[in-house]
Amino acid sequence: MKSILLIGLGRFGKHVAMHLHNLGHQVMAVDSTEERVNAVLPYVTEAQIGDSTNESFLSSLGIRNFDACIVAIGDNFQSSLETTSLLKELGAKLVVSRASSDVHQKFLLRNGADQVVYPEQQLAKWTAIRFSSNHILDFVNLEGDYDIYEVDLPERWVGMSVGEIDIRKKYGINIIAVRRNGTLDFSVKPETVFKDGNTILVLGQYRELQKCFKI
């Protein structure tokens, strides 16, 4: 369980609060709007109404005590930038800030953000890949050229083993799990045999995935 400071409780921030709650973390939520603060009360440990660009207010929260500080402000980039910078100055261990454009992302990283999340960009990539490909069921966007994909098992692989298809050698794609009857099995070995109805979780580059799975 971690202690999280969440600043900015719009739609994105509220969903972050809900998921952190479901994961069992302690969350202090902050927003300048009382209505937004009240909306997340069922999901957070503590909540405060305040201006996150005010150094005295932020300092009173005990920034150094949090494992991570998430700046989810999406409607005011100036406030997001100032809050990010102040958090770092006050000794935040980890600052994760939301960006809404490539330019915002660069400025946030230069002004104290350890990591930046870009929901619109990430969702756009997910949508483009997921719905333009016949065999990709889901995917997780990682940094760089490599991503994790869940794909349908090609019919020609039914009855074959991981070692026999050897897509790691041919395409640089690693099979990291097999889904059977709705459950993911991560204990994949060279002798693991594929069965009809399986889906597989793979790590690789999209262009190689296209070649391997004829996407």
Predicted regions and their residues:
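Cytosolic regulatory regions of ion transport systems
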Residues: 1-215
